[in-house]
């Protein structure tokens, strides 16, 4: 908060016209005023004041009263003035803080001074006659030393599919090792430290790297990583479209104005992990999911009860200011891609029904990778007490006990917030997929639908990331590979996600016949949008086969003179370690079977390996133990 204090012989103001839509109702404060011997406090409320307004107001009021006493003023006038800083608080917050300041000054000194406040958000004319003594013109800058934090008291339970309720401590002996790890971390505060995570090595091996010229927690995506990011994004959309409800796909911006009340209120609920910036005198927040953009669109739609349920999907360019010491490749990032799906439902009961389809997809996609989810249900106290039957229905669908965290009602926008955790190869619970039942944001953003009686209602909004963020899904894929190797299997990634799906290796790259055969096979595969390349480098066959294995290519096909004569290729299949001689059409069928139900994304690399520069990240030898 910045203030300019003028000790005035005379001060007169009159409101002229509204300056902003959020202007204060002048019926509540004086629309005009005339004062003699007044300390006029020209006051700018800044964005930083909103983190702990109580401390700022108390500090400012105490100082203002002391100054008024020193100069011998008869009246203190709090006068909103937006010109002392470029970093303004949102209007609705500034208005509240100015009212708090007026009340605090009255509380401290109503027996000594008259206290008045001019209306906020108006253009005003004023006349000022300054005394001109040494203390008649002063400026002050008030800042909270601490950020106000409200400690949220939580209760923890374990709820079984049979409806039994346990304390976390009671259930530990019954829990599987993986669920025990979830309970210990989430409910008992036990952290696993000092364990090197082999998944980080795989992320780096496939070209997921930190960008040293950016902020902490920002990644760059090399060609292999870029392909994987694009493929997972396409797959997330395929899953959204597979739902039995209509889903719209949209795109939007990545920053929103905190001066807008719904944006500010939603951000305040999110907490202190916001990326904020100032531009053109505006205080902006980088979005942390797709909520702002999708809700801004949905508020403009004309919605009937017949339109619901209705989904909206976007891959949101998302930003969260995670602590620099906690960022982890592909998992905890400051900038990431979130395939965010929001579904409008008519009621919480309808949302529970819709969630059945979501839960099936969430569990199925983890199981495809050989992973198992363990659920943490964050619920409000009123939902826990009054709608436990609905909660039990959700837990029964998961098919295993769930950890329940009960929060006081009314502090968040959701009544149910479900986190699905895997326990990774380092023994740490990792949240991947999620869904929530949101009962607050429809009203906050003005999203309405009309029922069969032509009455308006606010829908319940389901938030879900069916496979988590794109990077976290890839983390889960790599973690599954680490677990494979520990079981004695050859680690692999699914064919649809492999940057190169087939590599053709002529035994003699100088042989026109072998190279021609490889090119014909490549053309056949490419016509079906299969990612294939040809290793035509003048290196030994053994070296080129090892390089292909280092890239975890699912199908490595060697072509020699015999293959040219017989019209075949000699294929090594990574997943099974089988080696087979097949016709090109048979190889095509093998790959197409792997790709059934998955996206086809064009390669991010040249067809010929000889045309690549040296990709340093591929040269790394990775031991997963």
Curated annotation (Swiss-Prot):
The GO molecular function terms of this record are:
ATP binding; threonine-tRNA ligase activity; tRNA binding; zinc ion binding
The record's listing under InterPro entries reads:
aa-tRNA-synt_IIb, aa-tRNA-synth_II, aa-tRNA-synth_II/BPL/LPL, Anticodon-bd, Anticodon-bd_dom_sf, DTD-like_sf, Thr-tRNA-ligase_IIa, Threonyl-tRNA_syn_edit_dom_arc
What name does UniProt use for this protein? Threonine--tRNA ligase
Q: Write out the ranges of the annotated region (Editing domain).
A: 1-149
Among the entry's GO cellular component annotations, what is one? cytoplasm
The protein's role, per its UniProt record: Catalyzes the attachment of threonine to tRNA(Thr) in a two-step reaction: L-threonine is first activated by ATP to form Thr-AMP and then transferred to the acceptor end of tRNA(Thr). Also edits incorrectly charged L-seryl-tRNA(Thr).
Q: How is the cofactor bound?
A: Binds 1 zinc ion per subunit.
The entry marks the following residues as binding Zn(2+), namely 291, 342, 463
On assembly, the entry states: Homodimer.
Q: Where is this region: Catalytic?
A: 197-494, 198-494
- List the source organism: Hyperthermus butylicus (strain DSM 5456 / JCM 9403 / PLM1-5)
The record's PROSITE patterns line, in alphabetical order, gives: AA_TRNA_LIGASE_II
Its EC number(s): 6.1.1.3
* Location in the cell: Cytoplasm
């Amino acid at each position: 908060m910045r203030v300019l204090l003028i000790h005035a012989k005379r001060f007169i103001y009159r409101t002229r016209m509204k300056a902003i839509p959020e202007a204060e109702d002048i019926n509540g404060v004086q629309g005009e005023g005339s004062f003699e011997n007044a300390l006029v406090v020209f006051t700018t409320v800044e964005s930083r004041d909103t983190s702990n307004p109580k401390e700022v107001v108390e500090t400012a009021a105490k100082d203002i009263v002391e100054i008024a006493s020193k100069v011998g003023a008869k009246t203190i006038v709090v006068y909103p003035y937006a010109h002392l800083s470029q970093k303004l608080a949102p209007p609705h917050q500034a208005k509240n803080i100015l009212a708090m300041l007026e009340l605090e000054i009255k509380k401290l000194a109503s027996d000594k001074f008259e206290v008045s406040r001019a209306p906020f958000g108006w253009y005003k004319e004023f006349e000022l006659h300054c005394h001109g003594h040494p203390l008649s013109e002063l400026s002050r800058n008030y800042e909270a030393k601490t950020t106000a934090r409200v400690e949220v008291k939580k209760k923890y339970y374990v709820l079984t599919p049979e409806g039994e309720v346990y304390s976390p401590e009671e259930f530990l002996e019954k829990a599987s090792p993986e669920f025990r790890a979830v309970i210990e971390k989430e409910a008992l505060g036990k952290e696993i430290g000092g364990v090197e995570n082999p998944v980080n090595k795989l992320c780096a091996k496939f070209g997921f790297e930190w960008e040293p010229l950016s902020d902490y927690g920002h990644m760059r995506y090399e060609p292999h990583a870029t392909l994987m990011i694009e493929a997972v994004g396409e797959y997330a959309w395929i899953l959204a479209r597979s739902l039995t409800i209509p889903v719209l796909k949209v795109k939007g911006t990545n920053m929103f104005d905190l001066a807008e009340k719904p944006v500010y209120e939603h951000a305040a609920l999110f907490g202190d992990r916001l990326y904020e910036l100032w531009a053109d005198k505006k205080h902006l927040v980088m979005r942390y999911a797709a909520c702002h953009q999708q809700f801004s669109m949905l508020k403009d739609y004309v919605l009937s009860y017949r339109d619901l349920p209705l989904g909206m999907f976007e891959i949101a360019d998302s930003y969260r200011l995670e602590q620099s010491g906690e960022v982890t490749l592909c998992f905890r990032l400051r900038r990431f891609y979130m395939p965010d799906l929001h579904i409008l439902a008519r009621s919480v009961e309808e949302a529970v029904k819709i969630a059945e389809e979501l839960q099936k997809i969430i569990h199925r996609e983890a199981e495809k990778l050989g992973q198992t989810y363990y659920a943490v249900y964050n619920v409000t106290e009123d939902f826990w007490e009054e709608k436990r039957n609905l909660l039990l229905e959700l837990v029964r669908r998961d098919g295993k006990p769930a950890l329940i965290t009960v929060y006081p009602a009314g502090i968040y926008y959701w009544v149910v917030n479900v986190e699905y955790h895997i326990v990774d190869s380092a023994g740490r619970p990792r949240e991947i997929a999620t869904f929530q039942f949101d009962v607050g944001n429809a009203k906050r953003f003005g999203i309405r639908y009309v029922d069969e009686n032509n009455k308006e209602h606010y829908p319940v909004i389901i938030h879900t990331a069916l496979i988590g963020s794109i990077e976290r899904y890839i983390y889960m894929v790599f973690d599954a590979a680490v677990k494979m190797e520990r079981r004695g299997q050859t680690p692999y990634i699914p064919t649809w996600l492999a940057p190169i799906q087939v590599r053709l290796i002529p035994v003699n790259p100088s042989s026109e016949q072998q190279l021609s055969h490889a090119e014909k096979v490549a053309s056949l595969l490419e016509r079906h949008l299969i990612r294939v390349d040809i290793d035509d480098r003048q290196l030994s066959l053994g070296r080129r086969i090892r390089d292909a294995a280092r890239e975890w290519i699912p199908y490595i096909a060697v072509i020699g003179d015999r293959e040219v004569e017989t019209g075949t290729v000699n294929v090594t299949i990574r997943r099974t370690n089988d080696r087979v001689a097949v016709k090109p059409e048979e190889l095509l069928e093998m790959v197409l079977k792997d790709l059934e139900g998955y996206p086809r994304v064009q390669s991010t690399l040249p067809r010929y390996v000889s045309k690549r520069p040296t990709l340093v990240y591929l040269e790394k030898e990775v031991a997963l133990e």
